[in-house]
From Swiss-Prot:
It is found in: Periplasm. The Tol-Pal system is composed of five core proteins: the inner membrane proteins TolA, TolQ and TolR, the periplasmic protein TolB and the outer membrane protein Pal. They form a network linking the inner and outer membranes and the peptidoglycan layer. GO terms for cellular component: periplasmic space. Part of the Tol-Pal system, which plays a role in outer membrane invagination during cell division and is important for maintaining outer membrane integrity. Keywords: Cell cycle, Cell division, Periplasm, Signal. This is Tol-Pal system protein TolB.
Length: 426
C-alpha cells in the first residue's frame, strides 16, 4: 500500500512529486494554559530599560512563563535594579517565591551594560547575578541569557532560551528559510527561493542547517553554514532526495532517496561518496531520525499497510515497530534525553501531536488543534515546537510535554511551517 500525500504533512510530499538578512516581521508570543506545578516569580522592570530599545524584564517574563515551570507574579509599576534588596514581607504577601531585579545602562561606545540579581524570597537569600556588555543588536540575547541563568538556578536544569529555531515561511510565491531566537523573535533569513524549501535540520553543534530545496525542479539536499551563509550540495541523486537528519556525532546524515526506485533510507557521508542503503523494503520508508545516543534510527514506513513509526540499528537490519495506537502515525522526533517520542497521529480527519514515553509505550495526545506537523524538541527535552493551524492561521506553537502550557508564535502573513529546534549554544 502506498503512502498518500498527506503522510508528509508537506515534508514527505517531495517523495511524490549567503548570509543572513533581517526579518521583515517579528513574532508575538501568546501563552495559554496552567501547569500543575509552577514556581511563582516576580520579575521587576529593569532600571533604565525604558531608554533601551528592548524591555529586558518583559522578555525574561515571557521566556520563563513559556517554559511552563514558572508563574509570573504581578509587578506592574515596580522598577528595581540589581542593588535593590526586595522587601521580603511584601513579596511573600504577593505570593512570590523568587524575584529578578536588574538594570540596563547605555555606554559611551553605543553598547549596553545589562545586570541582574536573583533573589530567593522564601529564604531571604541572594542567589547571585550576572552582567553582560552587549551591542544594541544583542539586547534580546542578553535577556534570553538572563532567563537561562534564572531557569538553571531555580530548576537545576540548563535553560533553552538562548537557543535558536529554524523554520520555513511561504509568502505569495516566495519561500524563506529563517533562523530565529527560541521565542521566534530576531528572525534572520538564511535562504530565499521561488521554489519550495522543506525539512530544515540543525547539525548537533548548531553551525549548519541541512534542508531540501526544489530550486533544481526536484528535491535536492544542501548543508548551509549559518555563520557564513555558504552552502554545499549533499545529495542530488536520481529521483528524490529528502528528509535529511544528522547523526548525533555530526559526521553523517541519513536521508530518504529514491535513486534505486522506491523511497528508502540511506546514510550519507559529509565528504561525498556512495550512500549506504539502510532499509531494504518495497514500501515507502522515510522521515528518519536518530536517537540521541545513536543506537537507533526511527523512521516512518507503510510496510504494514499504513504509515507507522519503526526503528532500526544505525547500520540497518530488521526494523521493529514502535507505534501501535492509531492507524496513521508520522513525523517522529526523539527527545534529547532519549525518554520521549513526539509524532503526529491522524485521528479521524485531524492530525494531532502525540507524545509517547518510550519506556512504557504509553502515548498521549497533547493538543486540541487539528493540523499539527513537524514536532521538534527543545534541547532540554522540556518543550516541543511544532507547526499547526489555529483560528484559520498558520502558526508555530510551543508546548510542554503534558500539553498544559502552550505559546503561540504568530507572525504577520504567510504560511509558517517546518520548525526545527537547534541545540544548546557552545
Amino acid at each position: 500500500m502506498s503512502i498518500t500525500p498527506s503522510l508528509s504533512r508537506r515534508t514527505v510530499m517531495s517523495l511524490l512529486a549567503a548570509g543572513l538578512s533581517p526579518a521583515f516581521a517579528q513574532f508575538r508570543v501568546e501563552v495559554s494554559g496552567v501547569g500543575l506545578t509552577q514556581l511563582p516569580i516576580a520579575i521587576a522592570s529593569f532600571r533604565g530599560e525604558v531608554q533601551a530599545p528592548q524591555k529586558i524584564g518583559n522578555i525574561v517574563r515571557a521566556d520563563l512563563e513559556r517554559s511552563g515551570m514558572f508563574r509570573p507574579v504581578d509587578t506592574a509599576g515596580i522598577v528595581a535594579d540589581e542593588n535593590t534588596r526586595p522587601d521580603l514581607a511584601i513579596w511573600r504577601q504577593k505570593g512570590a517565591d523568587a524575584m529578578v531585579t536588574g538594570s540596563v545602562s547605555p555606554l559611551a561606545d553605543g553598547r549596553f551594560d545589562v545586570r541582574l540579581r536573583l533573589w530567593d524570597i522564601v529564604r531571604g537569600q541572594d542567589l547571585g547575578g550576572q552582567s553582560y556588555t552587549v551591542a544594541q543588536a544583542d539586547l534580546r540575547l542578553s535577556a534570553h541569557r538572563i532567563s537561562d541563568f534564572v531557569y538553571e538556578k531555580l530548576t537545576g536544569e540548563k535553560g533553552i532560551f538562548s537557543t535558536r529555531i529554524a523554520y520555513v515561511t511561504k509568502t505569495a510565491q516566495r519561500f524563506n528559510l529563517w533562523v530565529a531566537d527560541s521565542d521566534g523573535e530576531g528572525a534572520q533569513s538564511a535562504l530565499t527561493s521561488p521554489e519550495p524549501i522543506i525539512s530544515p535540520s540543525w547539525s548537533p553543534n548548531g553551525s549548519q542547517l541541512a534542508y531540501v530545496s526544489f530550486e533544481s525542479r526536484k528535491p535536492v539536499i544542501y548543508a548551509h553554514d549559518v555563520a557564513t551563509g555558504k552552502r554545499r550540495l549533499l545529495a542530488n541523486f536520481r529521483g528524490s532526495n529528502s528528509a535529511p537528519a544528522w547523526s548525533p556525532d555530526g559526521k553523517q546524515l541519513v536521508a530518504t532517496l529514491s535513486r534505486d526506485g522506491g523511497s528508502q533510507i540511506y546514510a550519507l557521508g559529509l565528504s561525498g561518496g556512495d550512500p549506504k542503503r539502510l532499509t531494504q523494503s518495497s514500501s515507502i520508508d522515510t522521515e528518519p531520525a536518530y536517537s540521541p545516543d545513536g543506537r537507533y534510527i526511527y523512521f516512518v514506513s507503510d510496510r504494514g499497510g499504513a504509515p507507522q513509526i519503526y526503528r532500526m540499528s544505525p547500520g540497518g537490519g530488521n526494523p521493529e515497530r514502535v507505534t501501535f495506537t492509531g492507524g496513521y502515525n508520522i513525523s517522529p522526533a526523539i527527545s534529547p534525553d532519549g525518554r520521549w517520542l513526539a509524532y503526529v497521529s491522524r485521528v479521524g480527519g485531524a492530525f494531532k501531536l502525540h507524545v509517547m514515553e518510550l519506556a512504557s509505550g504509553t502515548a498521549t495526545p497533547i493538543t486540541d488543534t487539528t493540523a499539527d506537523e513537524s514536532p521538534s524538541f527543545a534541547p532540554n527535552s522540556r518543550l516541543i515546537v511544532y507547526a499547526t493551524q489555529q483560528q484559520g492561521r498558520e502558526a508555530l506553537m510551543t508546548t510542554t510535554l503534558d500539553g498544559k502550557i502552550k505559546a503561540r508564535l504568530s507572525g504577520a502573513g504567510g504560511d509558517i511551517r517546518e520548525p526545527d529546534w537547534g541545540p544548546f549554544q557552545r
